[in-house]
């Protein structure tokens, strides 16, 4: 009972933080979201680094954190000053930092190639992946608000629907070797939840509230509704894949949670594992719509 109470309180606090960040971003200033995502990237990198260190050579964390910070600076300068692709600029920083890492490892007596591989892994997951979430904030209106809201609606809806449908119907396991509690019925429920979230946001975009917070059409005519629903579906798939990938890492290194930072909920990565993959899918989908 005490654990349930702790989980509810922490869950409520997380919800309030998410809503506050979204509203401050959409109604006040874009920097709130940038700072939030950078904090997730740094916190997530520390957790993943600590996790894989339990079984594999320890990543060079200072280089990972430097990649996150310098990559963010390059991203913002590219988007706001030079007016070129932020994602491209970020990955240029990643490439430079990888070269610096190789030189550093070659000159070190304590580190070897395995440390370099571990470091590069954390550079990509979760740091580079979360830069796509950062990318939402620098999309043109109304894609910016739509993308942010889709991510923070679809992923939670997927998790909630998957939990309740899976707990109720049970049935055959989805990936018992990776996550014994996940069922096929739960996965289907999650897909329904993500699709419902996309549909609800479509209807919200048609209201005065949606207009007030910066939402709008993703495309013209009937295809607008279809795109909201399709993003909900594919982002739900990505959310569940991200969840399984995080579970795979935790099982490989023999841990239950990435940390105990969030009482009853584990660590940062335990809360955003699905979002890490979903943000990539949503960003690419919306980028294609913008290019059309």
Regions inferred by a protein language model and the residue ranges of each:
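C-terminal-most transmembrane helix of multi-pass membrane proteins
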Residues: 278-279
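Hydrophobic, small-residue-rich transmembrane alpha-helices and their short perimembrane loops
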Residues: 238-239
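Membrane-embedded alpha-helical bundles of polytopic integral membrane proteins
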Residues: 1-233
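Interfacial loop-to-transmembrane junctions
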Residues: 251-275
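Juxtamembrane boundary at the C-terminal end of a transmembrane helix
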Residues: 284-292
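Active-site catalytic microenvironments for nucleophilic, acid-base chemistry
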Residues: 199, 203, 252, 287
